[in-house]
A protein has these predicted regions:
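The feature marks short, hydrophobic/small-residue-biased sequence motifs that occur predominantly
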Residues: 106-151, 156
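Extracytoplasmic
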Residues: 62, 126, 134, 156-159, ...
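Mid-to-C-terminal secondary-structure elements
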Residues: 137-146, 164-276
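Membrane-proximal extracellular/periplasmic loop immediately following the first transmembrane helix
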Residues: 39-114
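Short, surface-exposed beta-strand/loop "edge" segments at domain boundaries and coil↔beta transitions
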Residues: 72-78, 120, 245-252
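Gram-positive cell-envelope targeting signals
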Residues: 1-47, 277
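Hydrophobic beta-strand segments of well-ordered beta-sheets in folded domains
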Residues: 61-69, 107-111, 161, 211-215, ...
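Solvent-exposed, acidic/flexible segments
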Residues: 82, 132, 161-162
Length: 277
C-alpha cells in the first residue's frame, strides 16, 4: 500500500508561550482603546456645555468664569428677578473697577425652564413634546450640533420661532432638513428655526428628560401656557459667564447677590471637567 494516504499525520506543535503572551497583550490593548474612546466621547459631550467661558473669552486677556444656579422645585425664578440681578451684577463690576470693553460685555447669561409637555402639530401629525423655555444666549452654553437651520435667542425680533430636536423633527416631518417649515402650537403658527442633536451626557439627559423635545423662547412659553395674565413659567436653571479678576469672584457674586441666594444651588463649571482628572 502507498504510504501517502495513510501516512501518520504530523502532530501540531503547541503555540509558543511568547506568542500567546503577545496575543493576550494585543487583545488587552484593543479593549483599553475601546474603553478610552467611550470615555473620551463622554467627556467631550460634557465639555460642550462646560466651555462657555472659553468661547466667550476668545482672544481677550481677561479671565472669565462659568457659574450656574439651580433652583429647587417650587422656588423657581422669574425674568424680572434676572433683570434685577443684571443691574446688581453691573454695579459689582463698577465696584471692582472693571471696565466694559468697547463693543463688548463683561458677562453673558442664559436661563431655562424645566421641560413641559406641549402639543405641537403639522397638517398631518400631532405630537406631545418635552418643551423647554430658554432665555438669554442659551445656545452659547448649550451649542447642540445643528442638523439644519439655526438657533433661537433673545435677539430675535419675534418669539414665533422654535428649535426641534432630531427625534421630534423626524416624528413630525420624517426629515431633519426642515428649517423654515411651520408647526402649530395652541392653534398658532411657529416657524422651525433649526433642528439639533440632543446632548448625550447623563446630567443633560436627567435635566431634559427622555422623549422628543423642542426649545422655544421664554416669552413664547409664557404665551403658550396662558399669556401674561397667567403665572410665568418658573426658571429652574440660570447660567452665567462673567469676568473674574480674582479666583472665586464669580461664585462669590452669585452667593452674595443672586435673588434666591438662600435657596439656590450654585456650581462653578469652568475647568470642572478635564482629561487630567
Amino acid at each position: 500500500m502507498s504510504g501517502g494516504k495513510f501516512a501518520r499525520r504530523r502532530k501540531r506543535k503547541p503555540l509558543p508561550l511568547r506568542f500567546l503572551a503577545l496575543l493576550l497583550l494585543n487583545v488587552a490593548l484593543v479593549v483599553l482603546a475601546v474603553v478610552f474612546a467611550v470615555k473620551l466621547h463622554h467627556v467631550t459631550n460634557l465639555l460642550i456645555t462646560q466651555s462657555a467661558a472659553e468661547v466667550w473669552k476668545g482672544q481677550s486677556e481677561e479671565n472669565f468664569v462659568q457659574v450656574s444656579a439651580f433652583q429647587p422645585v417650587g422656588k423657581e425664578l422669574t425674568e424680572s428677578q434676572i433683570e434685577t440681578f443684571h443691574q446688581t451684577l453691573e454695579q459689582k463690576f463698577v465696584d471692582a473697577s472693571l471696565e466694559t470693553p468697547e463693543n463688548g460685555s463683561l458677562y453673558q447669561d442664559a436661563w431655562s425652564t424645566t421641560a413641559q409637555d406641549i402639543t405641537v402639530s403639522t397638517n398631518s401629525v400631532t405630537y406631545t413634546a418635552k418643551t423647554i423655555g430658554v432665555g438669554g444666549d442659551f445656545f452659547l452654553f448649550h451649542p447642540l450640533p445643528l442638523r439644519s437651520g439655526s438657533y433661537i435667542s433673545n435677539r430675535d425680533f419675534t418669539y414665533d420661532r422654535v428649535v426641534l430636536d432630531e427625534e421630534l423633527s423626524w416624528a413630525l416631518f420624517g426629515s431633519y432638513d426642515v428649517a423654515g417649515q411651520t408647526v402649530w402650537i395652541s392653534n398658532e403658527p411657529y416657524v422651525v428655526a433649526g433642528v439639533v442633536s440632543r446632548e448625550k451626557d447623563k446630567a443633560s439627559s436627567k435635566a431634559y428628560t427622555d422623549g422628543a423635545g423642542m426649545f422655544v423662547t421664554y416669552s413664547a412659553l409664557t404665551h403658550i401656557t396662558g399669556g401674561e395674565e397667567a403665572k410665568e413659567p418658573g426658571i429652574s436653571c440660570y447660567e452665567l459667564v462673567m469676568a473674574e479678576p480674582i479666583t472665586g469672584y464669580g461664585l462669590s457674586v452669585l452667593r452674595e447677590s443672586f435673588p434666591t441666594k438662600d435657596k439656590s444651588v450654585f456650581d462653578q463649571n469652568t475647568n470642572r471637567y478635564s482629561l487630567k482628572n
